[in-house]
C-alpha cells in the first residue's frame, strides 16, 4: 500500500492484511474518500461509483473494521441487496474478507 493512504491506516489489522493478500498497491478514490466517513458513524452515507469502481469494498472495509475493533454479541450488520445474484457474489466476497476471524456471515 502506498505511503499516502491515510484511510488504509484507519482499517483494522485483519482488514489491512486482507488488502495486502489481494495484491492491492493502493485504494481506489471512492474507498479513500468513503472509509473515514463510514468509520465516523455520525451520518448516513451513500456510495456511488461506476460498475467495478470499488463501491462494495468502500462500504465493507470500514464496516468490517468497526465490527472487528468493537466486538459485540448478537447482530451487527444487515446489508440489503436488490438481486439474489448480487447477494451471492457479496456473500462469497465477505467470506473471503472474514476468513481467519470469528465473524459469521449469513446470506438470506
Residue ranges and their predicted role:
Residues 9, 17-108:
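Conserved P-loop/Walker A NTP-binding site and adjacent catalytic elements of P-loop NTPases
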Residues 1-9:
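Compact, charge-rich alpha-helical regulatory domains located at protein termini
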Amino acid at each position: 500500500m502506498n505511503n499516502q493512504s491515510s484511510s488504509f491506516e484507519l482499517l483494522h489489522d485483519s482488514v489491512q492484511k486482507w488488502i495486502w493478500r489481494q495484491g492491492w498497491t493502493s485504494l481506489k478514490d471512492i474507498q479513500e474518500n468513503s472509509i473515514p466517513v463510514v468509520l465516523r458513524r455520525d451520518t448516513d452515507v451513500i456510495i456511488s461509483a461506476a460498475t467495478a469502481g470499488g463501491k462494495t469494498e468502500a462500504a465493507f472495509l470500514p464496516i468490517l473494521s468497526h465490527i472487528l475493533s468493537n466486538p459485540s454479541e448478537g447482530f451487527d450488520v444487515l446489508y440489503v441487496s436488490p438481486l439474489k445474484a448480487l447477494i451471492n457474489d457479496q456473500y462469497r466476497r465477505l467470506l473471503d474478507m472474514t476468513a481467519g476471524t470469528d465473524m459469521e456471515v449469513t446470506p438470506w
